[in-house]
Design a protein with these regions (language model features):
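Conserved donor-binding loop and adjoining core beta-sheet/short helix segment
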Residues: 16-53
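Conserved active-site alpha-helix within GNAT-family acetyltransferase domains
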Residues: 78-95
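Conserved GNAT acetyl-CoA-binding A-motif
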Residues: 65-78
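Sterically constrained small-residue positions within well-ordered secondary structures
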Residues: 9-11, 23, 32-35, 64-66
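C-terminal "cap" of GNAT-fold acetyltransferases
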Residues: 92-114
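Conserved acetyl-CoA-binding loop-helix of GNAT-fold acetyltransferases
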Residues: 49-66
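Short, exposed beta-strand/loop patches in secreted or surface proteins that constitute
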Residues: 31-33, 73, 88-89
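Short amphipathic alpha-helix that is part of the acyltransferase structural core
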Residues: 1-21, 106-114
Length: 114
């Protein structure tokens, strides 16, 4: 069974890390930094081609932030475009951002299935 395991770090570069696990196997990791009233997705890496695992990691991180009173999110992770595209982040002022309720809303099949 797939589980998105949170690990609170509270360091300068990472507030929480989420690991996608299937039993003992790690399928991916997402790092979140809460700062300046923003939930910042700073890193995403997958050990699988299944982009839905990455989407689940993003949703777990954004839900974590929302439960702590954060409303806006930015995506600063490098080399994670395919995963980022699973949620409707928009480019504004040179960065990818969105309000968490909109990012967590359903996609109604508008996901690139590649």
């Amino acid at each position: 069974m797939l589980f998105f395991e949170p690990s609170v770090r509270n360091t300068e570069n990472c507030t929480a890390r989420f690991t996608a696990k299937d039993g003992d196997a790690s399928l991916g990791v997402c790092e979140l930094l809460l700062h300046d009233r923003l939930a910042d997705i700073t890193a995403v890496s997958l050990q699988t081609e299944d982009l839905s695992i990455g989407e689940g990691l993003l949703r777990a991180a954004l839900n974590f932030a929302s439960n702590r009173g954060y409303y806006m999110a930015v995506f600063s992770a490098k080399d994670a475009e395919k995963v980022r595209a699973r949620l409707p982040f928009e480019e504004k002022n040179g960065r990818l951002q969105g309000d968490i309720p909109s990012l967590l809303a359903g996609t109604c099949g508008n996901i690139d299935k590649s």
